[in-house]
Amino acid sequence: MSTENTSTAVAEEIPNLLITPSAQEYLGDLLEKQNTPGIGVRIFVENPGTPRAECCMAYSAPDEVNPADYKQEYSDFPAYIDAPSIPYLLDAVIDYNKDRFGGQLTFRAPNSKVPRVGPDASIEERITYILQSEINPGLAGHGGNCALVEVQDDPENGLTAVLKFGGGCQGCSAIDVTLKQGVETTLRQQIPELQRVVDQTDHTQAEGAYFK
């Protein structure tokens, strides 16, 4: 497999997306049935860096190629990767698993929902990045999640992050431990200017709580 930019633009990041041999075979057979010489697939992420991120794949005929895309050449077909999606496809794997019903194409992209933050990112963007990349993966094991509501500049307490918990965290009896020992500690270690973290969740609604 070779990777190249189909345009003359300088690459900030090179794709490391993996299409497994079984997925290559499946896609190659599928593309052959389209009767279009040179047809490939285009891979991109809709709503990248958000909880609504969705990894997508579409047919890409030669006359439909976006000149800014990155081309990964496989033995039977080319794959074109949307350049802005590359950071969100880091460590992504497209695989095909055969079963008694035929098989299923799977697309795992662990970084598709993780926001990207640069050195000039706002404190809101930095908090959201940490929540999405470090906090929520742990809470997901209990069916929970956490989101930033706002950052307040409190005259008495300084910069305060207001959070809201959902899923299995809402109404959970262990939420104070989760907030103080987990979320607040992690956020304040990485964002020193943050003075306080508070919970705005209505925990009287405990129907789906992990601990009651």
Swiss-Prot record:
GO terms for molecular function: 4 iron, 4 sulfur cluster binding; iron ion binding. [4Fe-4S] cluster binds at C169, C172. InterPro entries: Fe/S_biogenesis_protein_NfuA, FeS_biogenesis, FSCA_dom_sf, HesB-like_dom_sf, NIF_FeS_clus_asmbl_NifU_C. Disulfide bonds: none annotated. One of its GO terms (biological process) is protein maturation. Pfam families: Fe-S_biosyn, NifU. It comes from the Bacteria. Binds 1 [4Fe-4S] cluster per subunit. The cluster is presumably bound at the interface of two monomers. Keywords: 4Fe-4S, Iron, Iron-sulfur, Metal-binding. Its cofactor is [4Fe-4S] cluster. Involved in iron-sulfur cluster biogenesis. Binds a 4Fe-4S cluster, can transfer this cluster to apoproteins, and thereby intervenes in the maturation of Fe/S proteins. Could also act as a scaffold/chaperone for damaged Fe/S proteins. NCBIfam families: YhgI_GntY. Belongs to the NfuA family. Homodimer. This is Fe/S biogenesis protein NfuA.
